[in-house]
Amino acid sequence: MDKVLQGYIDKLNKLNFKDMYEGDFFLTWEKTDDEIEAVFTVADALRYMREHNISTKVFESGLGISLFRDNSTRTRFSFASACNLLGLEVQDLDEGKSQIAHGETVRETANMISFMADVIGIRDDMYIGKGNKYMHDVVDAVTEGHKDGVLEQKPTLVNLQCDIDHPTQCMADMLHIINTFGGVENLKGKKVAMTWAYSPSYGKPLSVPQGVIGLMTRFGMDVVLAHPEGYEVSLPSPLKISRVRALTWFVLP
């Protein structure tokens, strides 16, 4: 066994992430510290394996389903690359060319696309109060389908950005910061400055800063958010009490 890989395995053996198995990933603040650290550790291990030409295939066959209800470049290609890295083929669902346009329900669509699927990645960030709820509706539908014997397995859902959080991007940013400063233990007190960015939808500019606030303050970092007046983020209740002290507001003129 490669010594570096063994080090990653030893680290994982010290973490409790058993509840993530066959689970879904909606929001980072729903995960424990051990679970977040396990994601970072596996990501580092996969990168090391890729760099050293060691196979990362977990699946011999299977599908990764992507559904983008908003435009995407980086996340779309990242999801496809990740599926390929693990041995899954990607099928992208175009709602405009599906029966959804003719009134097919979430339950019908979710179960249809889930045959032979191991993971579903969804981006739905356009409207406040809609995206995260839709993802939960999909999970409820495939869970019921599996329970009723329609599906032989329940695919895992990964949030590729909703109206509340952008967990994959925020964790990728966080891991880069961890590697830059030489470990999680070196992040406390570091300051992150973030500025509001224009988007045609209101939901997208909210989910990224909320995700950064929710994840980076968790590791003791100070987040400064600059935004126009009237564009304050609406922190989900679990974050309001525990993280607000590490957040500074700066209103742009």
PLM regions and their residue ranges:
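Short, conserved catalytic or adaptor-binding loops enriched in Gly and charged residues
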Residues: 18, 142-152, 238-244
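Phosphate/diphosphate ligand-binding glycine-rich loop within oxidoreductases
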Residues: 57-178
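Glycine-rich phosphate/diphosphate-binding loop of Rossmann-like nucleotide-binding domains
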Residues: 69-84, 178-253
